[in-house]
Amino acid sequence: AFSQLNLSADLVWSGGYSPVEEPTEGPDGWWENNWTSGEAAKAGWDLWSTNEEAKAWSDKFSNVLVCGDDQIYRYEGYFQAPESSSLKNWSSFVAAEMSCQYNEGKSFTELKSNIKDFRAWLMENSTGEEFSFGAYIPTGEDSADFWWYNWHGDFEAMARGNANWEKNGKEMQAKFDDTATCT
């Protein structure tokens, strides 16, 4: 329903995340909007806050989702999954997220190198199922240096992908571990 509002051509994707386990603190879900730029995001939110159709949508779905502007986080996404294996259907998926801190002397430079190697690893070692990944780099205050996300079509695909990673990804995991500590 949200995507049907068609408020901005600069809004690339919107979707919600609902945790599998109830969180002990913080929000019980997250809404993500991907914009073409930071400027487009600001303009989009300015439009949203004054748009009657958007207000009507918010009121209609207030029993499902209420978003406050006190918890808006800004990131630059770095997405390099091979197109051939990327998740195609973003209407329903499962995700795993990790909060990451760079190890001493490491930075986005090493992370980009790891991602390039991981992309090549995926092209040779994937399960053949759709899979996407990304790094979200904070552009403001954040508890993490970056957030790592893995997206799978469903929990079964995630289990198969994780088993494949455990079996075949040890060398690649060591490269990631040298760059950052993720939890």
Predicted regions and their residues:
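Short S/T/G/P-rich N-terminal loop/turn motif that feeds into the first structured element of a domain
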Residues: A1-T183
